[in-house]
Amino acid sequence: MSTTPQMSQSGFQDDQLEAGAREDVGTEAQEKPLSTTGTMVDEPQPNPNVVDWDGPDDPQHPLNWSKAQKNLHVGIVSLSTLAANLAATMFAPGAAELSDEFNITSATVTAMTVSLYVLGFALGPLLLAPLSELYGRLIIYHFCNMVYMAFTIGCAFSTNVAMFLVFRIIAGCAASGPMSIGGGTVADLFVQEQRGKAMALFAVGPLLGPVIGPIIGGFVSENVGWRWTFRILLILSGILATVTFALMKETNYTVILQKKALRMRKETGNEKLVAKSSRDETAGQMLARAIVRPLKLLIFSPIVLLVSLYTGILFGLIFLLFTTFPSVFQDVDKLLGSKKGEENAAPRPEDRLLLMKWLGPITPLGLFIYGWTAENRVHWIVPIIGTFIVGFGSLFVVIPGQIYLVDAFGAEAAASAMAANLLVRSPFGAFLDLTAEPLYSKLGLGWGNSVLGFITLAFTPVPWIFYTYGERLRTHFQVDL
């Protein structure tokens, strides 16, 4: 005969945990409500078959993990994101060698060997992010690691360009896993006030990876050939996959409670036990609802749409400017740069936009400086300063933008919000650089970069609008997830 399991009946919500709420759920001296006739009535009792957290201090809840354990998870996810973006441009210096080997004569096809990988960043999250919110983050990390390594091997041993391109885009889809669900992992581990530094570390990968990738890739392809680029990426991904498998744990609240309910059903024999957050839906219904969630956020939430467009344009600018460096800096042997970002705690999501408000407008300034000084052959240090300003401004648009989306939608929908962001951002990174040749051949570096500067200038009011009206917009344009 089964016994009633001992479990939490308190009905604690995750927002109570985040706020540090404490309730004495065992006190029977609480005042009962009165009926309309003035008699005492009993409050509804918690369902004994619903499995919940064991109070706000439950050690199984990711918010209550040790600081070291939280930082370990953020570090692994951030390194995985950096490695994924490193692969985006690390192969670029070897693309010409691949073209010679496979007899590629089309410049567009050569460019696709790089851009299709970044396009995978937009396609993968449409499925991976929703699945992570249904089945957990950890299984998606493991799946993406395995698929990425398999198709990176395929890239390294490709025998024709068609095979290479297919393997490349699938590898990009798999590499998007950490980028699309990493924000959800951070939201699972930290309350909003503690989330800034972790999100800054996580968000720097998409900016730093494309910068250092060509430096490493140029050295590798020149000395040992383009295929070794993928072998090195395979070694790196193998190390990260091993560390992920050995050290990471599940952080999705719903999945943790579901596993707890499953364990208790086996221990007690009570098949009626269910996790508190379980929905009365079939697996197919939950999957369909989760898959359309990023698209709904993108269509119905102006916050997600405009922040994604703004960060996407600046993300694409980084790739586009790379195409002009060989001609502008052909006499310069070494380029050095540094970036760093810091985000402070914020009591409301819109306060994350302070740095974007004030530093976002310097990006078009950098484009104007870079374009016209390069056009007029000013000393090379001046265009370098212009590109540094572009990079610095982009840093403080992309990172605060991602933190804002995670804070605005919380642990429940952070992965879907990031997926929507990647859906817009990644095509800019994949295809904006393809416009470089017609843009600069017709307009020159001066007016070509000025056009880009005016486009980014048009988006500078976005953080100012959301800083003032963001909370009202979030309330008015609530998306049924």
Curated annotation (Swiss-Prot):
Assigned keywords, A-Z: Cell membrane, Glycoprotein, Membrane, Transmembrane, Transmembrane helix, Transport
Biased composition (Polar residues): 1-13
A Pfam family hit: MFS_1
InterPro entries per UniProt: MFS, MFS_dom, MFS_trans_sf
Annotated TM spans: 72-92, 111-131, 147-167, 169-189, 200-220, 228-248, 302-322, 353-373, 380-400, 403-423, 446-466
Superkingdom in the source lineage: Eukaryota
UniProt function note: Efflux pump required for efficient secretion of trichosetin or other secondary metabolies produced by the trichosetin gene cluster. Plays a crucial role in detoxification of the toxic trichosetin in Gibberella fujikuroi cells.
Stated name of the protein: Trichosetin biosynthesis cluster MFS transporter
